[in-house]
């Protein structure tokens, strides 16, 4: 990103394929700032960007400064495929779990699941490298493209898909990421950004040729086979924030993050 680009023209994104349907082919008037999920909230608050898909848990921590943009998010309705607890033993037997330094929501979600099961293993924050994590701990939490790849490489070490576990317990979708803006960021610019991103999402949903192009690009950038990327977008992750997703988000913010009060939206549809 060049120094001359105003922050009002910058959109943050996670460097994972889970939001490629939103960002692939996005109008070039927007400058894109890629960063790990746990960094995006800081970029947003420091006015490095206009909006970004921040971790849901970070919205709970900064809801006094931020409002949410409607319709878009990073959502699962069962298996998410890319937020995975690995280990050589079941979760009930894990004495310690390594947590990735690049995540916020998945750590809150795992803590909530452990509490729900009456478990209290030691947790250690580490860089997101599965081999190193499992050398140090019984369990390892991984997110994003690394998790997708590791599931294929080490299938016998998969102990839990956290999206599936949330939905099994609550009956609601799990919202891992949500687009937010600062309360004082220009509303019209945020509307324009949301509209452009939503247009890309709709193209992905409705245009088979475009969908295949996005899948091919995501496969090439991540090294994940096209068939697996297609399955991921078909059955696991999606970018639509509907009322069921909002219900799940509200429950996560309240139950797992302890956020008081209601979600504040930048505008209502």
Predicted regions, residues:
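Pocket-lining segment of extracytoplasmic ligand-binding domains
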Residues: 125-215
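Beta->alpha turn/N-cap motifs
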Residues: 15-18, 36-38, 48-65, 70-72, ...
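Short catalytic helix/loop segments, enriched in acidic residues and glycine
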Residues: 30-40
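Hydrophobic/proline-rich hinge and linker segments of small-molecule sensing/allosteric domains
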Residues: 68-91, 168-185
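Secondary-structure end/capping motifs
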Residues: 186-255
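Hydrophobic residues within well-ordered alpha-helices
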Residues: 43-45, 133-134, 256
